[in-house]
C-alpha cells in the first residue's frame, strides 16, 4: 500500500512538471516581441497618424546661445534668448523619439547633407531631415541624424556648425537643452498641437477602408 502511494505521488509530480513545462513553452511561442516591434517601427516614418508638434528653443551647451534657422537657409547657434529665428517647431516623425525640426519664422527644416553640413530646406520629408532625440545622463539632449548614423547636430563655441563626421554623442558640442521662448510661461505651452500629415494614396485607401 505504501509503495502504491509513493508511485502515485511520483506520477503526480511528473504530471505537474509536464504541465508547467508545456505552459511555459506556449507562452514563449505566443508572446509577441514588443521590443523588436518598437525598434522596427521607430525606423519608419509614420504616415498613417497625424504628427504632434511642439515649439521651443534649443540651447547649445558650447556656444551658450540658441540654434536658429535663417532666411538664407543657414543654421547656427548664435541666437539670443527670445530671438524670432530661435523659435523652433519640432514635429514627431514616429511614435518613437524621431523628430523633424524647422524654424517657425522661415519654415526651413534643419537637414544634414552627405558632407555632414547642416542646411535649411523647404521640404523636410527625407531621412536626412530627421533626427533621433537621445536624452543623456546629464539631462542634455543629443540629436543624431536618421540617415547618417553616428552623425550628430553640433556647434562650436562660436556657434558655427561642426562637420557631423567629427561629432560624437559624449562631446559638449552635441549637447542641447530644450527651453521655452522668452515670455512664454509653462502654463501657456500646450502639451502638443496636432497637424495633419499630407495624404498619399495608401493613406486615403486606409481611411476609406476604416469608414466602410
UniProtKB/Swiss-Prot annotation:
Coiled coil: none
Main location per the UniProt record: secreted
Glycosylated residue positions: 139
GO terms (BP aspect): dorsal/ventral pattern formation; fibroblast growth factor receptor signaling pathway; midbrain-hindbrain boundary development; neurogenesis; pattern specification process; positive regulation of cell division; positive regulation of cell population proliferation; positive regulation of MAPK cascade
Cysteine pairs bridged by disulfides in the record: none
GO molecular function: fibroblast growth factor receptor binding; growth factor activity; type 1 fibroblast growth factor receptor binding; type 2 fibroblast growth factor receptor binding
Known function: May act as signaling molecule during development of the midbrain-hindbrain boundary (MHB) organizer, and be involved in patterning of the nervous system.
Annotated protein name in UniProt: Fibroblast growth factor 8b
Organism: Danio rerio (Zebrafish)
Record gene name: fgf8b
